[in-house]
A protein has these predicted regions:
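Helix-loop-helix units of permease transmembrane domains in multi-pass membrane transporters
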Residues: 3, 12-13, 146-186, 449
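Long, hydrophobic alpha-helical segments
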Residues: 127-154, 158
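Membrane-helix interface segments
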Residues: 16, 170, 207, 235-238
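Hydrophobic/aromatic residues in alpha-helical transmembrane segments
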Residues: 144-148, 223-224, 240, 437, ...
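Transmembrane alpha-helical segments and their membrane-interface loop/helix boundaries
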Residues: 1-125, 239, 246-450
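Secretory targeting signals
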Residues: 28-38, 123-131, 142, 176-235, ...
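Residue-level signature of transmembrane alpha-helical entry/exit and packing/kink sites
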Residues: 2, 20, 134, 138, ...
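Membrane-water interface at transmembrane helix exits
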Residues: 149-153, 196, 200, 225, ...
Length: 450
């Protein structure tokens, strides 16, 4: 192990290398701490919303202790829903940074409520939150470049290259240097991530997959750095070329691909669905009540044999046209979700060629912060909203009195964290690309000449 101590001394003797490694360790630690702090803040928000909503419901119960048909309690009572962060969410914020993880809904039309909490600010969403995924995808390659760009040119400029190449087993020397430097970068990423995973209660399989993705991503960039560093250029030229490659692969090409996807697979924002549903609801006031009820009962025959509408206002008509408003945009909602999933599928395919995109998609999947996780939360909200509607419809359409005791019978939402293992194809593609580029770089390094 003397060679290891010797190579470590060489690295630590270089103030630039030592400072770079310490900086990466610090940045990763801050990113992990920031992610843990954010997920804890979200859990505290979720813990507060239930007692606050219970107090709100108690206020409604005092205001409407009894109702002849449950209309007023149905209209004024809110129900909290929440999407708790997974144990791995501290690693990658993903869509949790722009999509609500807490949403209160009523028995009224769902679509108008589902998207009114949507946040869309492209200037803020572009860079993303400073988390482990950000450090790995955008910053870690820069440290690989800093440690490997002068691997050969530095020895040439110092006049030692000819001597090193003349040594027996010289190829092993270069491989050891590359491996040690990459291992140190990996350690600066892995150590804070492991500590954060233990603090967050993350399972071992998920952590192992995250570390594998990090290792493969670093291997890709090590291969790229070697392909450039072995071309015989000066250190400055190597660094400039590698910085250009980094900008193209991590910033330019993903941005251009995103613009292309936006044009090829156009998808409206969720707020457009909200506006369409609200227009349908507002227009229902101009439609004869009997016509509205006929249309509603045709789609919900289980309420067909209930009492007819009285001549005065009745809440069941009001809730009926809210439900019809949701149904009027059902095709648009389906097209919206299908469009989002098509974009997601193309993004995953793009990750087969751009390792940064592929690694980020895998991390978001493990963390449960990607698009499928957000849509799964919306599905849970929709299923719960149907339970709430069905609960109140029993009072509204049967003219059954709603008393103080009935407030305790209300449905209760059960939140659960999202998160799943990524597809085998995504991990395999990243592995194949990383190992291919690394093998090409090591091959050139093994054929190094003065």
């Amino acid at each position: 192990m003397n060679w290891l101590a010797f190579e470590l001394r060489l690295i630590l003797r270089s103030r630039l290398m030592a400072a770079a490694l310490l900086l990466l360790l610090l940045l990763t630690s801050v990113a992990v701490w920031s992610g843990l702090h954010e997920t804890e803040r979200q859990r505290e928000t979720i813990a507060r919303i239930v007692p606050l909503n219970d107090a709100d419901v108690a206020s409604v119960a005092r205001r409407y202790p009894s109702s002849p048909d449950g209309g007023s309690p149905a209209y004024y009572t809110f129900y909290p829903t929440w999407d708790p962060p997974s144990h791995a969410a501290f690693l990658a914020a993903g869509l949790r940074d722009v999509a609500p993880h807490v949403l209160r809904v009523r028995a009224l039309g769902l679509q108008a409520q589902l998207y009114e909490g949507e946040t869309f600010n492209p200037e803020l969403a572009l860079a993303g939150r400073f988390d482990f995924a950000f450090v790995l995808i955008y910053l870690a390659p820069l440290f690989i470049i800093a440690l490997l760009h002068d691997l050969v040119s530095g020895e040439r400029q110092a006049g030692r290259l000819r001597m090193l190449l003349a040594l027996p087993h010289g190829a092993h020397l270069w491989r050891r240097r590359v491996g040690l430097r990459c291992l140190l970068v990996f350690g600066c990423l892995a150590l804070p991530a492991c500590i954060g995973a233990i603090a967050a209660g993350m399972d071992g399989a998920g952590l192992a997959l995250v570390l594998l993705v990090a290792a493969l991503y670093l291997a890709f960039w090590a291969g790229v750095a070697l392909l450039v560093a072995t071309r015989g250029w000066r250190s400055v030229a190597n660094a400039t070329a590698l910085m250009g490659i980094w900008a193209v692969l991590t910033l330019v090409l993903p941005t251009l691909a995103n613009v292309g996807l936006t044009r090829v697979v156009p998808v409206h924002q969720g707020v457009d669905l909200m506006m369409a549903q609200r227009e349908a609801v507002h227009g229902a006031w101009e439609i004869p009540r009997d016509e509205t009820m006929r249309k509603f009962l045709a789609g919900h025959p289980e309420w067909r044999d209930t009492a007819p509408l009285p001549s005065t206002f009745h809440y069941k008509w009001y809730f009926a046209f809210h439900q019809l408003g949701d149904e009027s945009v059902a095709d648009q909602v389906r097209a919206y979700r299908e469009g989002l999933m098509r974009r997601q599928a193309w993004t995953e395919r793009l990750g087969w060629l751009l390792p940064g995109v592929g690694a980020q998609a895998i991390l978001h999947r493990v963390a449960g912060t990607d698009l499928p996780a957000q849509l799964a939360y919306q599905d849970r909200i929709a299923a719960f909203h149907e339970r709430v509607r069905t609960f109140y419809y029993g009072y509204l359409f049967n003219d059954r009195p709603f008393g103080a005791a009935d407030y305790a019978k209300r449905p209760v939402f059960e939140g659960r964290a999202s998160g799943d293992a990524p597809g085998v194809g995504a991990v395999t593609a990243l592995c194949a690309l990383a190992l291919l580029v690394l093998a090409l770089g090591m091959r050139r390094l093994g054929r190094l000449r003065v």
